C-alpha cells in the first residue's frame, strides 16, 4: 500500500542524497502504474532536479518492455514491437482455434489464454512446457500456445506475459549482458515483494 511506497520513496531519496548511487543505478519496481507515478512524484518532490535520471523506476511490465526494446532481436522481434491487449489476444486465439478445428464452445479462448499465461508466469516457452497429465485440456492447449507464440513473433508483437518472459530468457542466455545490468544496478527495490510470482522473482534475481 501507500505506506510501503512511502518507505521505498524515502529509501530512494536517501540513496541519491547520500550519493550511494546515481539515479540510473537504482532499479525500483512496483506492481501498478499508480504506485510508480506516485513514487516518481514523491522522489521529485524530495530531491528536485537530483531525481532526474531515475529512468529505471516503474512496473514490472514497463521496465521489462524497456529492456526488451533494447534487446528485441535476441528473441526475433524488432525494437518497435507492439504490445497486444486482451481483446487482440482473444481474437488471435479464436483464429487459431478456427484453423485448427477446435470448438471454442468446448474450450473458451479466455481459458486457453489463462493456461498460456500460467505457463509464461512459470517461465515456460512452448517447447519447455511439461503437460499436467491430469488436465485433459492442456494437451489441446499446448499446440495452440506454439502457434500463438509464432504468430506473435510474425506480427512483431508481445502479450504482457512475454515482456517478462522474453527478458528472463535473454538474460539467462547472455552472461555478459547479465553482468552489465547487475553491475549497473547498485540497488534493487521492490514494492510488495511478497506478491511476486515465479517469473517476476526470477527476473529480479538475474
How would you describe each model-predicted region?
Residues 191:
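Charged catalytic and DNA/RNA-contacting regions of genome-maintenance
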Residues 1-11:
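Walker A/P-loop
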Amino acid at each position: 500500500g501507500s505506506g510501503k511506497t512511502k518507505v521505498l520513496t524515502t529509501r530512494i531519496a536517501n540513496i541519491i542524497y547520500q550519493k550511494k548511487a546515481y539515479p540510473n543505478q537504482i532499479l525500483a519496481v512496483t506492481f501498478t502504474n499508480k504506485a510508480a507515478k506516485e513514487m516518481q512524484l514523491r522522489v521529485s518532490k524530495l530531491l528536485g532536479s537530483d531525481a532526474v535520471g531515475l529512468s529505471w523506476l516503474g512496473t514490472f511490465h514497463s521496465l521489462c518492455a524497456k529492456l526488451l526494446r533494447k534487446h528485441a532481436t535476441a528473441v526475433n522481434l524488432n525494437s518497435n514491437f507492439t504490445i497486444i491487449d486482451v481483446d487482440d489476444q482473444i481474437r488471435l486465439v479464436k483464429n487459431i482455434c478456427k484453423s485448427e478445428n477446435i470448438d471454442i464452445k468446448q474450450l473458451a479462448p479466455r481459458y486457453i489464454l489463462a493456461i498460456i499465461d500460467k505457463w509464461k508466469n512459470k517461465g515456460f516457452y512452448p517447447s519447455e512446457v511439461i503437460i499436467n497429465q491430469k488436465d485433459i485440456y492442456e494437451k489441446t492447449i499446448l499446440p495452440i500456445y506454439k502457434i500463438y507464440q509464432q504468430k506473435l513473433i510474425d506480427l512483431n508483437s508481445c502479450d504482457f506475459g512475454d515482456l517478462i518472459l522474453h527478458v528472463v530468457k535473454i538474460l539467462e542466455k547472455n552472461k555478459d549482458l547479465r553482468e552489465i545490468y547487475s553491475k549497473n544496478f547498485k540497488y534493487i527495490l521492490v514494492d510488495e515483494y511478497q506478491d511476486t510470482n515465479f517469473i517476476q522473482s526470477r527476473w529480479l534475481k538475474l
